[in-house]
């Protein structure tokens, strides 16, 4: 039994490099971060069935990793897309991956939710500016700091995906790849992709923009952003967002300090995991988060071997993640276990579905937000930049 356990653990472990001193080690980390992020998002948003995922361990965290499955053509297709991303990433062409969710199979340009993964390649070696905007000091990025940031980013994604309102039952996926045009050959296309013909998208409803987090290595910067409908944020635990950002109106737009040269704008609702932990240390009973479905029983064994390099302690994780066994299972819920109460109108009549409300509000106000991922406000006519889209949608 002990031998079997020792043999199983290395096979199922998803290990981030303990030392990042070469560009190859950094590339391995960024690829794995992208894989874990996409897998976490698609799993907790219920896009693919359970059979499309395998179990892996990320230090003390049990995660589900997307895999090819003959019974799930969609997951197989997404894995192929990811391989195309890896090709562009390895060549240092890839600037941004946009994974978008849409509801009308005939209209993939009108999306309901999207996830942006941005990549930067640095030439400064191990010296880079990773301090806040108010502190311009440069400091060496240690492997320990990178690993902590990686674990923290994955945990932030978990928390957000658990608390967002559910997606419609039937959704489709598409992916757009954007490049650094100055170094990317005009005729380059990753495996499984073709030249895109529609750079912008139309967002259903009122979009909310969230900066989830980033990870820096001596050679790469990896950043994750999420755009979702405002109504999916209505039931989110407000303590997840930093107090400073909560006070800011939803309509207030702030410039993303890391991409000012691209003139991209995001609202100020950044996830603040550190603030959430501090509040729960003072008042542990205030947490209302459910336990991720990604955490299986074997994870309790892994927790006893927790690495000292983790960005948050075991006790903080326990305060952050609560059991969901006592929740009312008759209510609607997401795969993560988060329960959403059905709103009632006129005392006992359920309100119309969110999709019906969305269509009605769009008809009344004409609000369908056109979003260009790569346009500059300084240009009267936005410059068309090279991008790719899949040969086949999911």
Curated annotation (Swiss-Prot):
GO annotation, biological process: blastocyst development; meiotic cell cycle; meiotic DNA double-strand break formation; meiotic recombination checkpoint signaling; meiotic sister chromatid cohesion; oogenesis; regulation of homologous chromosome segregation; spermatogenesis
UniProt-annotated location(s): Nucleus; Chromosome
Entry keywords, A to Z: Chromosome, Differentiation, Meiosis, Nucleus, Oogenesis, Phosphoprotein, Spermatogenesis
Composition-biased stretches (Basic and acidic residues): 253-282, 362-374
Polar residues: compositionally biased ranges: 310-324, 343-352
Database matches in InterPro entries: HORMA_dom, HORMA_dom_sf, HORMA_MeioticProgression
GO cellular component: chromosome; nucleus; synaptonemal complex
Function: Plays a key role in meiotic progression. Regulates 3 different functions during meiosis: ensures that sufficient numbers of processed DNA double-strand breaks (DSBs) are available for successful homology search by increasing the steady-state numbers of single-stranded DSB ends. Promotes synaptonemal-complex formation independently of its role in homology search.
Protein name: HORMA domain-containing protein 1
Originating organism: Macaca fascicularis (Crab-eating macaque)
